[in-house]
Amino acid sequence: LADPSNAYNAQHIYVLGSLAEVKSVVLMVDLDHPDSLIVPLFTGCFDIVSGSSKASTGEEVAKNVEFDMTRVLVTVIDESPVLAPEVVDIIVAQFLRVDPRVMDTSNRKGKRPDAQVDSKQDTLLLKDYPAAYNMAKAICQACPERMTSHISQYFNNVIIDASVPAGQTNGSKHGARKPNLDDSDEEGEDIKELSKAHRLIRELWRACPEVLQNVIPQIEAELSAESVSLRLLATQTIGDLAAGIGVAGPPPSPPMDPAAYPPVALVDYDNTIPQPNVLLTPVSPKPFSQVHNSAYEAFLSRRLDKTPSVRAAWATVVGRILLTSAGGSGLHENEEQGLVRHLASMLRDVDEKVRAAAVDTVGQFGLSQIVHKLGVDGGCSTPDSLLAILAERVKDRKPHVRERAMKILARMWAVAAGDIEQNTEPVVSLLRDAPSKIFDAFYTNDQEIHVLIDRVLFETLLPLSYPPIKAKLSRGNSSQSQKQKDSQASEPEQETDVDKIRVRRILTLLRGLDEKARRVFFVMLARQLSMRSAVNLYLEACEKYNGGVFDKDEEQIKAQLSKIVDSLSKTFPDAARASADLWKFAKVHDRRSYQLIRFTMAAVSDYRTVVKATRELQRRVQTANNSPLLETLNPLVYRCGSLIFNRSHIPAIMSLSRTDENGLANAAQEMLKQISSQNPEVLEAQVQEMCKDLEAQAPKASSAGDTSAEDILKACSGFAKKLPAKLPKERKFFQALTNYALYSSSPHAAKHAVSILMATADKKEMYAKDLVQKCVKKWTYGSDRFLTRLAALSQLNLLAPREADEESD
């Protein structure tokens, strides 16, 4: 029967079918010592269905063989007055065939009698239940009363064995996973056996929960045991039972990629979640909380356990119950809200292990579960809501807790950024304020938190890989030259799109920041200029240092480099580590790396150049086996690189400031203002084009012109204060500015036009006198463009007071 390719296989199947139909197998129970036949019968049947892939042809054992064997074994169980414990062991062992730990053990140490695995199960990524598992499940379902009794006795024996010293136990110890328990070594071996039994219980609940009706009360008793190991194990087990999670483990976490493009929308999010295979799909045939209410209530009380490890385990499994909706059986609204409140309380636990476990649990939720489950009691700014308490953890006193919390909170916002940009409720009200909570941690004045915020900003909130810079070209049958032409034709458009897509993410972030967070955001951006100067000095010193090889002035060069390294190191939490890294980088003396860092900082570098340079720098450092250096170099590049104030972003920012797409105009205008005042160099590439736009849109006495010109004037005004020589000097441009000062419908536009004119014109006195004369001509309160002329006069009094005074006299 184990070899379907056998010439007599049809006859073998016929004999088995006849045996199952006639039930003559019951005769063996009347023999003396029937167990000597019954035990090999069960072993042989399970071996046959599990060893089918060993057939010479690779042909599978027929399904009717499995079916008839099940009927034969059920008949034996029904007719046997007493079932040998070995038979029960064989049956329940089949449920461990889907346990990755057992398969790993069998692969390393050879197959065990209680955990035989056929060759198609050698991988951990099983796709379906093995035949032996299905046979054992069918037997338990066909003989519920007998199997309930025998399985209860089986687990009772295991629990009794675990309650006495290891030297007095009399049952074989089977290999199992090493539990994460905190008790003594003497108890450890027995807890291992008990841990294996608890894994079996998880799978039996999924397969045939009826046989566990007498076992669950025993686990409930373990919840109140003195042993921490027992309480921990029982808490984990009941939590997984309620969540419908079997021995194969929980399903993989939903995708939460902050750099995914296009950004996923809430309405489509569930469609992006890959369906796990049947082994990992949570299934609870019955609602555990209703069938075993007493045990479930005892489990809920473990959130108050005196031992942190038990509370941490409780936080983990309660998250699974919420994620799986109690194994698919569903949670009542009040019950779900209660679990969310309890999980939120774990985020404020006095023990850091519990807080870390609760934060990690929240990190397992996908966008739809965050919105519809975790967000039921409010968003990041709702007092005492789960998301608000998670936001508190970004300032946790323990570094590993705040790091996890900040990354998870940032990832939530990043995945939801598309919906936040579109002002989609309830996503906006729940998660819009997440970046504000992260930037608020900046005020702790902790260098470690500052570095963490840098990482979160450029790796999660605004990841360098968002959006993908290179468009994936499909491999078609078209000629290579045609592809090249298409690529060249579409490349400018793709670059523009990349910049616009990224700018929309940046402006969405900026739009949602509160006033305190906004100040932090712009302080971080303004820091780029000072850091750029410092890093430039460092790179120049590295070049003089020449990897430690000198021709002259050795002491002076070393002293100069040491001074700069010390200055840069003070901005890191571990100054000694940062100093060592910067010295090592100088000794490596990779000139290409120096150039790459300069590319990332240069105001003339577009975003594509900055990202490529950053990635190449990271690759070069890793290839040279200097990966630890990135702990210092990455934050340094994030702080000095042109990652947000970037020249290729300017057209997209200007466009959004005019079109107000998705309500981003105000944020775009504020960004332009900050760029023009803090880092006007990035405007240099666009300033000539901006000035041409101003000329084209200039108002006249008969028309007010384009209102969107105000934003361009504001940006040019900031640029003119720092780099006036870069602006055009043509008379046509100055005439356009004069027209803005006199005829614009916006007083602000008039003010900015006067500022540009006074900063750039060689004959500004002449223009000032001319403007004053024209402003006061036929100028009475309430006259046409009264406020525009008033704004122009006030600005002239500030910037050209002598000429204004002369005319006023």
Please report, for each region that a protein language model flagged, where it lies by residue.
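Extended amphipathic alpha-helical scaffold segments
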Residues: 382, 389-404, 408-426, 437-441, ...
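Alpha-solenoid helical repeat scaffolds
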Residues: 30, 80-84, 121-385, 404, ...
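Residue-level signal for functionally critical sites in structured catalytic/ligand-binding pockets
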Residues: 302, 312, 346, 397, ...
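Long internal repeat-built scaffold domains in very large eukaryotic proteins
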Residues: 1-168, 185, 211-213, 217-222, ...
